[in-house]
Amino acid sequence: MSLWRSNEATVYLPPVSVSKVVSTDEYVTRTNIYYHAGSSRLLAVGHPYYAIKKQDSNKIAVPKVSGLQYRVFRVKLPDPNKFGFPDTSFYDPASQRLVWACTGVEVGRGQPLGVGISGHPLLNKLDDTENSNKYVGNSGTDNRECISMDYKQTQLCLIGCRPPIGEHWGKGTPCNANQVKAGECPPLELLNTVLQDGDMVDTGFGAMDFTTLQANKSDVPLDICSSICKYPDYLKMVSEPYGDMLFFYLRREQMFVRHLFNRAGTVGETVPADLYIKGTTGTLPSTSYFPTPSGSMVTSDAQIFNKPYWLQRAQGHNNGICWSNQLFVTVVDTTRSTNMSVCSAVSSSDSTYKNDNFKEYLRHGEEYDLQFIFQLCKITLTADVMTYIHSMNPSILEDWNFGLTPPPSGTLEDTYRYVTSQAVTCQKPSAPKPKDDPLKNYTFWEVDLKEKFSADLDQFPLGRKFLLQAGLKARPNFRLGKRAAPASTSKKSSTKRRKVKS
């Protein structure tokens, strides 16, 4: 007798087809038309540690400007489809659209090299654990001291057409069964946020939210004790499918430890008893050790700024195409973080020096200059290309004025005679609603280059460097050759008539 048995072998189904992300070089055609665009001198001045607010209101009188902040420039470019070209025969407006490709960039930095320091008048520093020459007794109620230090040295430059992403450790959410009680360590969570202009960089104390994770406001210096220090999430930006966040980046970091201290306060997690042999004192010193960072010497031999960089091949699928006519340049430079001391005299009549006769102020100034070389590119709008761009970013097609055209209306419309009369409804058409900026909730340093494009590359320093490395020559504006002879003036010939005898 035969019995039916189910097939116990594993059945493998074919994988579902997934759309493939392709490089922009497969549907973008580059032309031999290049433009130079550059910003004006970009300056910022403020207090290096905190913002100063007005006494009568909550408005900021002096902003916080520190050498330890991110500078995120949002560079706005003109729409090439509305650009005035001398010759438009190189593309078809009916079936093609124009885009910009960033091929060269130079971030200029002014001001001298210098090391900026920070500190806290009441830093939670208990003992010197590096060169301890005494037995530690019981700590008092308040052992905070005035300590200053220099920070980790960082030079960074990120280029992309979307805002960069940063990471930091923040306060997580516990499970319902594990509620955090007062005084217990909260759970940590790695958070991703957009890097905005004015965010603090990693200074050597970690990329974390000091506002929620350090309640005493004394474990770190003043400029970060109520801030969030962020670190660029290179792993997330590099793995972004379309490669819009990061075309390429330049990075240089260095740090060493200058001093070793420990912190006052009750140690929340005591040292296990099997890790040491008890002594006669009966109490252990604080094991909350921490170092003071230092970035060491700054030198012009290790600078990544004030140099041209040429983009031949990006790290992602986007090979420098500036979608939505914008570009994001993120800069960090702690090698020019000098804090200037400004002294003002209260009274000039005293001849004897007194400390109370003078007021001390701190200011930090920054200077930037952005220069670009853009290449004009064209995209042929086939059905496959438009479908791919729509799946990538539908707003690109909206900016190109692609959409469904409504059919002509066949209904009878009303037309009033006295349009200004108060007896009839208002006949004024409503203004079209402006397009919302998807990045309006973020803070960037806006740089408008819509009227800064020039085809005369040889008139700019970065343009001349580009012509040299590309092997191109500028078109001469005048002809060189033999000078033309001056026009000769005709003179009247004085001839005498002969008399003819009759």
UniProtKB/Swiss-Prot annotation:
Location relative to the cell: Virion; Host nucleus
Biased composition (Basic residues): 493-502
Pfam family, one: Late_protein_L1
Superkingdom of this protein's organism: Viruses
Example of a GO MF term: structural molecule activity
Disordered: annotated segments: 479-502
Keyword Transmembrane helix appears in the UniProt entry: no
Entry-linked InterPro entries: Capsid_L1_Papillomavir, Capsid_L1_sf_Papillomavir, dsDNA_vir_gr_I_capsid
Alphabetical UniProt keywords: Capsid protein, Disulfide bond, Host nucleus, Host-virus interaction, Late protein, T=7 icosahedral capsid protein, Viral attachment to host cell, Viral penetration into host cytoplasm, Virion, Virus endocytosis by host, Virus entry into host cell
GO biological process, one term: virion attachment to host cell
Gene3D superfamilies associated with the record: Major capsid L1 (late) superfamily, Papillomavirus (2.60.175.20)
GO CC, alphabetical: host cell nucleus; T=7 icosahedral viral capsid
Keyword Disulfide bond: yes
Protein family (similarity comment): Belongs to the papillomaviridae L1 protein family.
Summary of subunit composition and partner proteins: Self-assembles into homopentamers. The capsid has an icosahedral symmetry and consists of 72 capsomers, with each capsomer being a pentamer of L1. Interacts with the minor capsid protein L2; this interaction is necessary for viral genome encapsidation. Interacts with protein E2; this interaction enhances E2-dependent replication and transcription activation.
Function of the molecule: Forms an icosahedral capsid with a T=7 symmetry and a 50 nm diameter. The capsid is composed of 72 pentamers linked to each other by disulfide bonds and associated with L2 proteins. Binds to heparan sulfate proteoglycans on cell surface of basal layer keratinocytes to provide initial virion attachment. This binding mediates a conformational change in the virus capsid that facilitates efficient infection. The virion enters the host cell via endocytosis. During virus trafficking, L1 protein dissociates from the viral DNA and the genomic DNA is released to the host nucleus.
Name recorded for this polypeptide: Major capsid protein L1
Organism, scientific name: Human papillomavirus 35
Lineage: Viruses, Monodnaviria, Shotokuvirae, Cossaviricota, Papovaviricetes
